[in-house]
Amino acid sequence: MASILLRSCRGRGPARLPPPRSAAPRGPAGDLACLSGASAVGLMSYVPLPLGSCAPVRPVYLSLRADPLGCWTLRPKRACAVLAGPRLLPVRCWHSSRPLGDDSVVEKSLRSLKDKNKKLEEGGPVYSPPAQAAVRKPLGQRVLDELRHYYHGFRLLWIDTKIAARMLWRILHGHSLTRRERRQFLRICADLFRLVPFLFFVVVPFMEFLLPVAVKLFPNMLPSTFETQSSKEERLKKELRVKLELAKFLQDTIEEMALKNKAAKGSATKDFSVFFQKIRETGERPSNEEIMRFSKLFEDELTLDNLTRPQLVALCKLLELQSIGTNNFLRFQLTMRLRSIKADDKLIAEEGVDSLNVKELQAACRARGMRALGVTEDRLRGQLKQWLELHLHQEIPTSLLILSRAMYLPETLSPADQLKSTLQTLPEIVAKEAQVKVAEVEGEQVDNKAKLEATLQEEAAIQQEHREKELQRKSQAAVAQAAKEVEPEVVAEGAPGRPVAELQPEEPAVTLPSEVLKDSAPVLEGLKEEEITQEEIDVLSNACSKLKEQKKSLTKEKEELELLKGDVQDYSQDLQEIKKELSKTGEEMYVEESKASKRLTKRVQQMIGQMDSLLAQLEADQKAGRLGPAAEAAPAGETVISVSELINAMKQIKHIPESKLLSLASALDDNKDGKVDIDDLVKVIELVDKEDVHISTSQVAEIVATLEKEEKVEEKEKAKEKAEKEAAEVQN
């Protein structure tokens, strides 16, 4: 089961775009995508076209005091050769840790408890009271409900087992999983441990025992092999890598498992069902508190993964992103833009809206889909402050806020009414998953029927993605085959029976000078050179692996192990804070951690101790010279390499044009000091490799800037939390 971690979530189908055209004819009225009952957004007619390039769009300034982020445009199509020759396989990304800002179920439960206690202290309502008291059901009805619960539970167990077995079989045979598939697999594992608690004693103890056997039987399941002088070093590094990824996956599974609240009566799930019924069916307006409360459940990843294509196109047009391409490409550029906006919001809140000048205010409002031209400075500051209030204080997801702007609702509507209209446009699958999420956050018993429906809908979406990729692959193969067949036919059309030397070239038609039209636009020769294909991402991964091996660097493993220890510590601290918050209302005795979660936590702690021993053994052997020559680099800069070293390593693996290598190296060297950190480079590769898109070197620079911005925000938040804890300890 944990072998999922031994393969990257990489997509192989490149996202291509149609060639640039003149003004496309607008479609009929049916081509308008109506996002609400009262407003519509006019979209271009979507027609399947051969995939190529698109016209560039103007950049949008997101960072307030940094370089502008350019547009996300794809480059012309180019033939990709198969990478062959080197024995060193690519270093694939693992994607087992949670993305920045992706909170676990326990963290969401803690935040929900803090909000409730804060509202109780302020005297406000925690949630809308029920219209009437619950009536105790008859005994026969309760028995039937219990039987239905177990019936759907067994169905869910059977379907989860089938899906998990199919995904595991694909991984063992060298196939990769998409981001959606991996998220589905993680949820299924958490469900299996929840439905069958004793499964821990059957599966987990044999994971570490069987993984070395699986590595021997299925070598393709490993993301990379190590080209070393010592087989012992290779074995130890593989063992360390396997244990590290397995422990990270188990920790993610622990954080996905919800707490048990014995005092919960299912009120939160019922409240959500009533709320969604009001906005979808009855037309009754829910309270502002209900809208704000349940809007938090529709997270960015959940919303973007389930939006329809017209909605994705509308969001891209609103944010001035490329609106033509595959759904994966549209989601990727929207995800990157939302991540950049999140980091910018926190930086703006720290600096203060009043510290921004007019140009910065216009850039910030424009990047968030709000009016930026033709409005007063006070209006700009007001709408930006409202955005920060909703996003940072009310914790409304960014995707919902931008989607509400894409609907062009009247500006006189309140934020609650805008969110209500936005929620009405979301697909049904989003509501199903949100219903399951609210039960997990509140610690209530998860409805097996709702969980089953959400799992089946997610599986249907995964199968649809597979069909689209297969159709795209067949279409590209057919186009390539047709191009090969056309070339000999054109040559053979010369004049049959006559030698080629006798063929006289046709005289060109005489054209009057007044009729000659000259194109004064510059020819974009370097456009094709800037594209980074999936093959070149593999070459870059190879270069990183080779350079790290030359330096005998274990910094990445050390960093990931420290992050894992931090996740385990944060999880235990969250549990303690939950008990502290519950003690204010006298309910701490009713909420507890599940047995499977406790057992998995003990196993993860044991594996952390084993990995510490492995790291110590590897470092001792390297210093003693038993694993080859010791590294000469200083520990402080062992992962920092020069740009020339990176270029030379890529040249040794695969021939790439010099101009592209220089452009790529310049994009990775953000501070232009001629040095690149290998670990930072690996992070960029992991982010790009798991998406099914092609990017340019300029977009690589934007990704580097976004990651650095997020790291800066994360460091500030950690420093702030540390200062608050120290202040609390001093007061106590």
Swiss-Prot record:
Coiled coil: 448-478, 528-620, 701-732
Activity modulation comment: Inhibited by ruthenium red or its derivative Ru360.
Membrane topology: Single-pass membrane protein
Keyword Transcription in record: no
Region entry Disordered, spans: 711-732
Residue list for modification Phosphothreonine: 178
SUPFAM superfamilies to which the protein is assigned, alphabetical: EF-hand
GO molecular function list: calcium ion binding; calcium:proton antiporter activity; ribosome binding
Transmembrane segments annotated in the record for this chain: 195-215
An example Gene Ontology CC term for this record: mitochondrion
Keyword tags: Antiport, Calcium, Calcium transport, Coiled coil, Ion transport, Membrane, Metal-binding, Mitochondrion, Mitochondrion inner membrane, Phosphoprotein, Potassium, Potassium transport, Transit peptide, Transmembrane, Transmembrane helix, Transport
Domain called EF-hand: residue spans: 656-691
Alphabetical GO biological process terms: calcium export from the mitochondrion; inner mitochondrial membrane organization; mitochondrial calcium ion homeostasis; mitochondrial calcium ion transmembrane transport; mitochondrial potassium ion transmembrane transport; mitochondrion organization; negative regulation of mitochondrial calcium ion concentration; protein hexamerization
Record: transit peptide: 1-93
InterPro entries: EF-hand-dom_pair (IPR011992), EF_Hand_1_Ca_BS (IPR018247), EF_hand_dom (IPR002048), LETM1-like_RBD (IPR033122), LETM1/MDM38-like (IPR044202)
PTM notes: PINK1-mediated phosphorylation at Thr-178, positively regulates its mitochondrial calcium transport activity.
PANTHER family the UniProt entry points to: LEUCINE ZIPPER-EF-HAND CONTAINING TRANSMEMBRANE PROTEIN (PTHR14009), MITOCHONDRIAL PROTON_CALCIUM EXCHANGER PROTEIN (PTHR14009:SF8)
Protein family membership: Belongs to the LETM1 family.
Name this protein carries in UniProt: Mitochondrial proton/calcium exchanger protein
Gene: LETM1
